[in-house]
């Protein structure tokens, strides 16, 4: 009897000693692991902090949003500027060194040599089809011409906003505009656009679908036309297809890294007064027409004030933005 009790007590003692040893071993292992992990975290934290020279900014909403950054007070040292001008400008200036001269003048305003790019275009149509807005800031000089007010106004609406567009097959389908942002954009050497609104039975309202002469003309011999019709109503279209293309587009929002300077004209063309344009910061300006040298001098003198109403953007944009946005 006593032997059994001694054996039981001995087993308890052995179990207790064994359990104590196991717990001590586990404790040492855990301490080792914790110390190692803590050491690694401390080392990585030091390394990551040593390399963090950037500014943490929340990325929310549109990429056009203007954020204050470390270069804002350094005269845009890390930015690029594209200046677009009509081909008549270098012809009148007649100086092979004029771009170098302007680059040196921009340098006095804080824009390093090589950060300003000069881009020539021949006419409004060419520029609207292929603008190549690749710089952080893009400023377009447009010479006011009597009779081209509508083309200039619609060019401004086109390049001051982003558009997502798709081709239209007007020979097979009827089309309707679904809201204020939905427009039809027509481009070409001579665009005449006619429409025939349809009722629920696809019969013409005030027009005959089989006779384009009865259609309503909404654009006549224009290079660029942004067509706005009654929303939620099907329309049959007739367009001068040999000299013109038309696309179904949705306005996505302002392209805030673009500004337009109207050269000459008694009044500035204000697209913000257009009921189809959402209120926005004015990025259209006017300078008096004298000579092109005077125009460029004015731009250089006020370049930093002009850029302040714009928002820098890192994406490069070209004509694909208007048609097939990528």
Swiss-Prot record:
Keywords annotated in UniProt: Calcium, Capsid protein, Disulfide bond, Glycoprotein, Host endoplasmic reticulum, Host-virus interaction, Metal-binding, Outer capsid protein, Signal, T=13 icosahedral capsid protein, Virion
Highest taxon listed in the record's lineage: Viruses
Span list, region LVD motif: 237-239
Record PTM: N-glycosylated.
Disulfide bond entries: 82-135, 165-249, 191-244, 196-207
List of glycosylated residues: 69
Signal peptide coordinates: 1-50
Compartments (UniProt record): Virion; Host endoplasmic reticulum lumen
Binding residues annotated for Ca(2+) 2, in chain numbering: 177, 228-229, 231, 301
Predominant localisation class: virion
Name of the protein in its database record: Outer capsid glycoprotein VP7
GO MF assignments: metal ion binding
Species this protein is from: Rotavirus A (strain RVA/Pig/United States/Gottfried/1983/G4P2B[6]) (RV-A)
Region (CNP motif): 165-167
Subunit structure: Homotrimer; disulfide-linked. 2 Ca(2+) ions bound at each subunit interface in the trimer hold the trimer together. Interacts with the intermediate capsid protein VP6. Interacts with the outer capsid protein VP5*.
Record-linked Gene3D superfamilies: Glycoprotein VP7, domain 1, Rotavirus outer-layer protein VP7, domain 2
Task of the protein: Calcium-binding protein that interacts with rotavirus cell receptors once the initial attachment by VP4 has been achieved. Rotavirus attachment and entry into the host cell probably involves multiple sequential contacts between the outer capsid proteins VP4 and VP7, and the cell receptors. Following entry into the host cell, low intracellular or intravesicular Ca(2+) concentration probably causes the calcium-stabilized VP7 trimers to dissociate from the virion. This step is probably necessary for the membrane-disrupting entry step and the release of VP4, which is locked onto the virion by VP7.
Note: Some rotavirus strains are neuraminidase-sensitive and require sialic acid to attach to the cell surface. Some rotavirus strains are integrin-dependent. Some rotavirus strains depend on ganglioside for their entry into the host cell. Hsp70 also seems to be involved in the entry of some strains. In group A rotaviruses, VP7 defines the G serotype.
Lineage: Viruses, Riboviria, Orthornavirae, Duplornaviricota, Resentoviricetes
Pfam families noted in UniProt: VP7
Family affiliation: Belongs to the rotavirus VP7 family.
InterPro entries noted in UniProt: VP7, VP7_1, VP7_2
GO cellular component terms, A-Z: host cell endoplasmic reticulum lumen; T=13 icosahedral viral capsid; viral outer capsid
